């Protein structure tokens, strides 16, 4: 049973790491924005801070880079706006949990 947990933890970690290293599909205007803001990208955005204007500028966490997660907010006037924040995706949280559990058992 322990071997199965270790193998599953390794697979989840590898899959999560490979998906976090891949570049998300960039639109042309986002790519131009990234090139124009090269200096501001060097200062990363901490977890739970707004990343609406710089969607690829989130800092790294313990194991993975935080992802800019966006939601659509509807105001009382009925106007929709997009708000984004740096956070840990659920599959990264699961991988960190498994690794932390493995460290407690083996280490």
Curated annotation (Swiss-Prot):
Ranges in a coiled coil: none
Superkingdom of the source species: Eukaryota
Subcellular localization(s) per the UniProt record: Secreted
GO molecular function, one term: toxin activity
Family designation: Belongs to the neurotoxin 19 (CSTX) family. 04 (U1-Lctx) subfamily.
Expression sites by tissue: Expressed by the venom gland.
Residues of the propeptide: 21-41
Stored PROSITE patterns: SPIDER_CSTX
Keyword Disulfide bond on entry: yes
Note on domains (UniProt): The presence of a 'disulfide through disulfide knot' structurally defines this protein as a knottin.
Transmembrane stretches, start-end: none
Disulfide cross-links: 44-59, 51-68, 58-86, 70-84
Name of the protein in question: U1-lycotoxin-Ls1b
Keywords of the record: Disulfide bond, Knottin, Secreted, Signal, Toxin
Species annotation: Lycosa singoriensis (Wolf spider)
Keyword Signal on entry: yes
Position of the signal peptide: 1-20
Example of a GO cellular component annotation carried by this entry: extracellular region
């Amino acid at each position: 049973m322990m071997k199965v947990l270790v193998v599953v933890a390794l697979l989840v970690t590898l899959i999560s790491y490979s998906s976090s290293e891949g570049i998300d599909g960039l639109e042309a205007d986002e790519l131009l924005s990234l090139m124009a803001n090269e200096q501001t990208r060097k200062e990363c955005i901490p977890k739970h801070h707004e990343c609406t204007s710089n969607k690829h500028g989130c800092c790294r966490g313990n194991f993975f880079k935080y992802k800019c997660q966006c939601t659509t907010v509807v105001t009382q006037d009925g106007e929709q706006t997009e708000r984004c924040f740096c956070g840990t995706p659920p599959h990264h949280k699961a991988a960190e949990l498994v690794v932390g559990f493995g460290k407690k058992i083996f280490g």
